[in-house]
């Protein structure tokens, strides 16, 4: 049985490993020169610092099986993402918490007092929020919205917050305590040696053959009984209906001596600052020690045909086009579409692994 897996990220590698353990051979191809997709990590040859080449990836989940699955691949070090934001010449904790509120407004409020204080500033929620801006004004009020969300959102999405759905902001918590952990999941960490060695272990099996620098060609399908596709959904169909919209990222890399900003992630919400954030990569591995530091300034823009896609836009125009592509995908015999690109969704790594496990198990169950 010929099985082709397109994409050597977590989706493809997990499926290949599950099939291999069940006795099925597969070929994994990837157009890039490396495995692990956008989770790829590599050592900086000049400094020895472990770099998250496509931006920071912190593993966080409440899925105990997925957490155990990841830990079986290699040591996972505890890590808490404590994001900061530089706003109008001051540094604040993100997401907004009691410290942020007290510092920003010059107060010393206790939790209940802070809730009432913010509630007085919020716009009344007479009707459900439709736009990002509506949601922000109902959730945090105009002062915090203008300072922390408006400019950042415009830079990240290239659109007015009035044109974005409220659901985007619903993913961002607001806390009335001093918890500055960006995530709230039970399990959180980063692989000691990065993500790429974990994916390499998944692909290291005699029944798995991996080819890098190998883009998919339609003529490859003839020799396969089944294809697992984790590339762009529209790309599989040759973009025949048009291209689904994505945002991409550009990174401006620079090296300094010592410690540049004292944290892994510093957001820059001010509209006058052209980049969205600065990431300092040695802080993603605090168990290591380095004399120098490597930082990335991160710029967001619309993705072109040759760019690496990061975030699906999924506005009304994309939703209509997505529905058409989903209909094509459903009718495509012998092909399973997986992963964030294959399903045109924003997926955290734990969900990616969970869905890959479930997909492989379902495929194997159907063959019995």
Language model: regions and residue ranges:
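Active-site/ligand-binding neighborhood in enzyme catalytic cores
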Residues: 88-93, 98-226, 230, 237
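N-terminal Rossmann-like FAD-binding beta1-loop-alpha1 element of flavoenzymes
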Residues: 2-28, 360, 364
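Generic structural signal for residues in well-ordered beta-strands
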Residues: 76, 208-212, 335
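Glycine-rich FAD pyrophosphate-binding loop
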Residues: 20-45
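Dinucleotide-binding Rossmann-like beta1-alpha1 core, especially the glycine-rich loop
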Residues: 46-123
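Short, solvent-exposed loop/turn segments at secondary-structure junctions
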Residues: 10-11, 33-35, 47, 99, ...
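Mid-domain catalytic core of redox enzymes
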Residues: 214, 218-328
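C-terminal catalytic lobe of FAD-dependent flavoproteins
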Residues: 308-368
């Amino acid at each position: 049985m010929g099985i082709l897996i397109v994409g050597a990220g977590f989706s493809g590698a997990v499926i290949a490993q599950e099939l291999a353990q069940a006795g099925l051979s597969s070929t994994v191809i990837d157009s890039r020169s490396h495995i692990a997709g956008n989770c790829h990590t590599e050592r900086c040859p000049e400094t020895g610092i472990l770099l998250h080449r496509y931006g920071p990836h912190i593993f966080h989940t409440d899925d105990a099986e997925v957490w155990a699955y990841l830990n079986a691949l290699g040591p996972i070090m505890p890590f808490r993402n404590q994001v900061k934001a530089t706003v109008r010449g001051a540094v604040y904790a993100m997401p907004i918490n009691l410290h942020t509120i007290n510092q920003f407004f010059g107060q010393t409020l206790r939790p209940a007092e802070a809730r009432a204080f913010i509630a007085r500033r919020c716009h009344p929620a007479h009707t459900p929020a439709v736009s990002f801006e509506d949601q922000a004004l109902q959730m945090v009020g105009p002062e915090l919205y203008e300072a922390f969300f408006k400019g950042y959102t415009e830079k990240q999405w290239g659109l007015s917050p009035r044109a974005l759905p409220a659901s985007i902001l619903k993913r961002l918590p607001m806390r009335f305590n001093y918890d500055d952990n960006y995530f709230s999941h039970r399990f959180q960490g980063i692989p000691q040696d990065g993500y790429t060695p974990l994916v390499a272990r998944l692909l290291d099996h005699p029944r798995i053959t991996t080819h890098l620098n190998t883009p998919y060609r339609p003529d490859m399908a003839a020799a396969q009984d089944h294809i697992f596709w984790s590339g762009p959904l529209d790309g599989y169909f040759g973009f025949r209906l048009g291209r689904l919209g994505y945002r991409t990222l550009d990174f401006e890399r620079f090296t300094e001596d010592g410690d540049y900003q004292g944290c892994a992630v510093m957001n820059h919400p001010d509209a006058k600052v052209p980049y969205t954030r600065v990431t300092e990569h040695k802080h993603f591995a605090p168990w290591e020690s380095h004399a120098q530091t490597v930082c990335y300034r991160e710029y967001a823009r619309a993705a072109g045909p040759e760019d690496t896609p990061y975030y699906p836009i999924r506005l009304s125009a994309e939703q209509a086009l997505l529905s058409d592509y989903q209909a094509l995908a459903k009718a495509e015999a012998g092909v399973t579409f997986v992963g964030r690109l294959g399903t045109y969704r924003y997926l955290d790594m734990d969900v990616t692994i969970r869905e890959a496990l479930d997909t492989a198990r379902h495929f194997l169950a159907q063959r019995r």
